[in-house]
Amino acid sequence: MGIQGGSVLFGLLLILAVFCHSGHSLQCYSCPYSTARCTTTTNCTSNLDSCLIAKAGLRVYYRCWKFEDCTFRQLSNQLSENELKYHCCRENLCNFNGILENGGTTLSKKTVLLLVTPFLAAAWSLHP
């Protein structure tokens, strides 16, 4: 195979790579401010690598979310909620309504303050 044959082969491989790209993206339920079961699905963008379900009172949020931002602080700020029960997961359609009954994380700002206060007191007592 000469130079021309190698170039043709390379070109074909490049075209195959472009057209056969799997482009797999995570699929999540997405119904912001929903109070009922969510049945609308969406394909998440590449920077949103997890599905979120968060419950605050009667409001239930379903959406794509960045996994590293799945913390009480981030969720509380973004959703403007003071108390949340939430769950982030990384499988297709894993943020279904019943998942919070089986687990999830419930925190409020008061709980976070109660958890942090002993550590602050200990650090303060160690400081001369």
UniProtKB/Swiss-Prot annotation:
Keyword Glycoprotein set for record: yes
Residues with lipid group (GPI-anchor amidated asparagine): 102
Keyword Membrane appears in the UniProt entry: yes
Keywords associated with the record: Cell membrane, Disulfide bond, Glycoprotein, GPI-anchor, Lipoprotein, Membrane, Secreted, Signal
Recorded topology in the membrane: Lipid-anchor; GPI-anchor
Disulfide partners: 28-51, 31-38, 44-64, 70-88, 89-94
Subcellular location: Cell membrane; Secreted
Record PTM text: N- and O-glycosylated.
Glycan attachment points: 43
Propeptide: 103-128
Residue ranges annotated for the UPAR/Ly6 domain, each copy included: 26-108
Signal peptide: 1-25
Gene Ontology BP annotations: negative regulation of activation of membrane attack complex
Molecular-function GO terms, alphabetical: complement binding
One Gene Ontology term, aspect cellular component: side of membrane
TM stretches of this protein: none
Predominant localisation class: membrane
Quaternary structure, from the entry: Interacts with T-cell surface antigen CD2.
Role, per record: Potent inhibitor of the complement membrane attack complex (MAC) action, which protects self-cells from damage during complement activation. Acts by binding to the beta-haipins of C8 (C8A and C8B) components of the assembling MAC, forming an intermolecular beta-sheet that prevents incorporation of the multiple copies of C9 required for complete formation of the osmolytic pore.
Protein name as catalogued: CD59 glycoprotein
Organism: Callithrix sp.
